[in-house]
Amino acid sequence: SFDDEFKMDNEKQFAKITASSEYTKIESQSGNGHIMYKEITDGDTGETPYFTDQVSVLYTGWFKRYWTQDDTFIGDDGNLFKNKVIFDSTADRNNVPSKFTVGSELIDGFSTALQHMEVGDKWEIWIPWQLGYGASGRGDIKGYSTLVFEIELLEIVK
């Protein structure tokens, strides 16, 4: 079925990232799996948020409908198909940072990353569906979607 293929495609992509030496693994505290990250900028501040802290972040989240295809491609119908979907981004809100409580307002994978980041860090993180929106999905995000975020941790809000 389409869903099975979609699930397999997403799991295969995450496995590919997991096997890549460019990325580092972090186990989720929930025990439901791991995320992968690549450091883009090293904040080097030594300040890491706790589960209960509120943080200020800039981020962009995206996924692909078909991981084997380019970000955009010409479909069988001859039309341009937008394959890479940005589903949420502070860039679309005038780069106003978002504030979240690390442990209670975020999907598991995002929360896991934040607890290992230092203020000033900018990471690319890959989240498997188990630590994202699960089998049911949310809004534009279908169930079993592997998610990618670029996150910049600006501050721990006191």
Locate each region found by the language model.
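Cross-family detector of peptidyl-prolyl cis-trans isomerase
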Residues: 1-158
